[in-house]
């Protein structure tokens, strides 16, 4: 392992960690993240060592500008400057004596986003990408909005914790003697990214910047997408491989926002071997290892379980779009006007979090009972692959109304398992087309397909701005039917870890009801302390969101604390945030303190107001 810096054209330098194979020169694969490669994500090291030792790839890990041990300021996620930086990094890597000049790019979540973004920039040496659990559309399918509706519980998670994380110092041993000056620059000049996101409630040019959709033609290199049906970025699967005009490969499993080799739910597979085979094909002119380009796991009917370890089902392989796909339209009878209940949705998972502490879906009967529902008997196995749509004429009287649609599998014993869901911020009246999240599912004979419609999907997204009703007329459900062919070959995957990486110890995911005051509250939290290559680290996350079911007033509270202990410094960044929405605005207060041991280094206070869409 080698640590180095790449000097940018503007004089800033980016920290890079290199894992080099014994046989050189070799192709290089790049991952670039803001999550501090040398401490907070240093535990990911075994994967990079495997790429080098077992598969002969050089691996480069980079802290993006202003994060970890890289210079500059992290003014926002997915900055235009970040793409310029990484274009320079790719050129630097390609010019090294140990590199063949062929570069691939990969990454989970943030690293998947910028893999897509760099492919759109078309740097000369970038030959293939593998985005994992990422989205092609920053507005419709990220931690910020879902169908235009503000994500709510995510606001106390990533949307907040990046503020204190960005105020932590570079690793002194890596940066050198001026590390404290660089730390103080971060502390003095950074502002929370959340404020920028809240300032853009509509789908405007801000969100198109960094999104692949709708201009997929910008990508002209081979792209392998890894997606998970229990992850929040599952829509970047079928639709994306169908739209990119370059060789594509889809690997979609039952996984949450964790590595396919260790995720719950499984089955778990060795994704590193699959990625290496894909890079072999396009960085080394190797042979194609899959007979068909796309492989996904079709989940079969099963009981709901928030800590499910393994999903029943089968792997499918096919081209996409597939000749075995068709649409089936089902007319849903009109039902009486529905009075919106703001805390419907608690039995479902929290979409973008996708893993503990938020868990997987529980029994949906709790939410079904507070929704409009239609049940359709399933007399023989019924399989779908793709996105379900609900079209209807909707009249809503709530301020800032939404429509939330859930598709469920109801077993003979009455238990209701979530298959997919979709949420859309809507106008007071008009035609709507709600696209549910992509999935692959098979209902067993004797079960029922249930459609549930409500005016809230809380706490996944913010509830409407006040009480009201929802009326649907002329609703039609469109199912993406898939007829499986058992004779089609599927890859022989190497099994992943026998045990998942999810650990419920120390995890909080609680639902509370104040019966007298009619307030529902969801509480989340987790904490950990661990060794790092240069010291120790501690992370603590505590948050809750609430809704008054009479007035629809909603609150969010988040308390996040990071501590990094190096021989030179014990740095702590502690942030407390409160958000209130009770109508047309989000009122945000945030206070951050930064300490060196017991000594206060800086203190920031913000109070901002942002419009609701």
Indicate residue ranges for each PLM-predicted region:
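N-terminal cap/lid segment of alpha/beta-hydrolase-fold proteins
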Residues: 1-23, 378-380
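Proline/glycine-enriched tight loop/beta-turn segments at coil->beta junctions
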Residues: 12-14, 20-28, 218-220, 401
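Cap/lid segment of the alpha/beta-hydrolase catalytic domain
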Residues: 24-94, 143-144, 399, 411, ...
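Accessory cap/linker subdomain of secreted extracellular hydrolases
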Residues: 45, 120-218
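Alpha/beta-hydrolase fold nucleophile elbow
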Residues: 97-109
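Short glycine-enriched nucleophile-adjacent loop
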Residues: 112-123, 240
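Short beta-strand/loop motif that positions the catalytic acidic residue
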Residues: 219, 225-227
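C-terminal, loop-rich substrate-recognition/catalytic regions characterized by aromatic stacking residues
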Residues: 251, 259-260, 264-595, 599-613
């Amino acid at each position: 392992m080698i640590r180095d810096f790449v000097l940018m054209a503007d004089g800033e330098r980016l920290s890079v960690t290199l894992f080099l194979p014994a046989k050189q020169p070799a192709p290089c694969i790049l991952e670039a993240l803001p999550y501090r490669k040398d401490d907070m994500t240093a535990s990911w090291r075994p994967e990079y060592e495997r790429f080098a030792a077992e598969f002969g790839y050089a691996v480069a890990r980079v802290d993006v500008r202003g994060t970890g041990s890289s210079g500059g300021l992290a003014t926002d996620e997915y900055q235009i400057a970040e793409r310029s930086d990484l274009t320079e990094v790719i050129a630097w890597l390609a010019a090294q004596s140990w590199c063949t000049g062929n570069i691939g790019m990969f990454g989970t979540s943030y690293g998947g986003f910028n893999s897509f973004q760099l492919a759109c920039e078309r740097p000369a040496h970038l030959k293939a990408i593998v985005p994992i659990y990422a989205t092609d559309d920053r507005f419709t399918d990220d931690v910020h909005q879902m169908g235009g509706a503000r994500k709510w519980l995510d606001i106390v998670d990533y949307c907040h914790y990046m503020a204190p994380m960005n105020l932590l110092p570079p690793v002194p041993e890596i940066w050198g003697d001026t590390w404290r000056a660089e730390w103080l620059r971060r502390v003095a000049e950074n502002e929370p990214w959340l404020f920028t996101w809240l300032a853009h409630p509509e789908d405007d040019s801000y969100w198109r910047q960094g999104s692949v959709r709708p201009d997929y033609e910008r990508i002209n290199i081979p792209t392998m997408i890894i997606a998970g049906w229990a992850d929040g970025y599952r829509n970047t699967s079928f639709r994306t491989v169908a739209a990119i005009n370059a060789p594509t490969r889809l690997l979609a499993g039952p996984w949450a926002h964790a590595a396919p080799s260790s995720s719950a739910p499984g089955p778990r597979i060795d994704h590193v071997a699959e990625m290496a085979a894909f890079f072999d094909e396009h960085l080394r002119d190797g042979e194609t290892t899959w007979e068909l380009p796309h492989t996904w796991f079709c989940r079969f009917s099963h009981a709901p379980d928030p800590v499910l370890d393994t999903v029943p089902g089968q792997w499918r392989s096919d081209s996409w779009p597939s000749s075995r796909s068709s649409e089936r339209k089902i007319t849903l009878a009109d039902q009486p006007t529905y009075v919106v209940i703001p805390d419907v949705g608690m039995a479902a998972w929290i979409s973008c979090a996708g893993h503990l502490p938020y868990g997987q879906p529980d029994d949906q009967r709790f939410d079904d009972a507070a929704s409009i529902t239609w049940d359709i008997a399933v007399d023989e196995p019924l399989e779908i692959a793709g996105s379900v749509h609900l079209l209807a004429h909707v009249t809503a009287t709530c301020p800032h109304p939404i429509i939330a649609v859930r598709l469920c599998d109801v077993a003979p014993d009455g238990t209701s398992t979530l298959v997919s869901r979709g949420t859309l911020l809507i106008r007071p009246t008009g035609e709507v087309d709600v696209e549910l999240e992509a999935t692959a599912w098979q209902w067993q004979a004797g079960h029922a397909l249930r459609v549930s419609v409500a005016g809230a999907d809380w706490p996944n997204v913010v509830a409407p701005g006040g009480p009201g009703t929802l009326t649907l007329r002329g609703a039609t459900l469109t199912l993406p039917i898939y007829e499986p062919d058992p004779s089609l070959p599927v890859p022989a995957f190497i099994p992943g870890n026998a045990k998942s990486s999810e650990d419920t110890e120390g995890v909080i995911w609680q639902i509370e009801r104040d019966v007298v005051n009619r307030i529902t509250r969801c509480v989340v939290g987790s904490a950990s302390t661990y060794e790092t290559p240069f010291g120790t680290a501690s992370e603590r996350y505590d948050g809750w969101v609430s809704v008054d079911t009479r007035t629809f007033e909603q609150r969010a509270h988040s308390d996040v604390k990071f501590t990094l202990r190096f021989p030179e410094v014990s740095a702590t960044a502690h942030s407390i945030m409160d958000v209130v929405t009770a109508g047309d605005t989000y009122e945000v207060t945030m206070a951050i303190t930064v300490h060196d041991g017991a000594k206060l280094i800086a203190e920031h206070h913000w109070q901002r107001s942002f419009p609701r869409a």
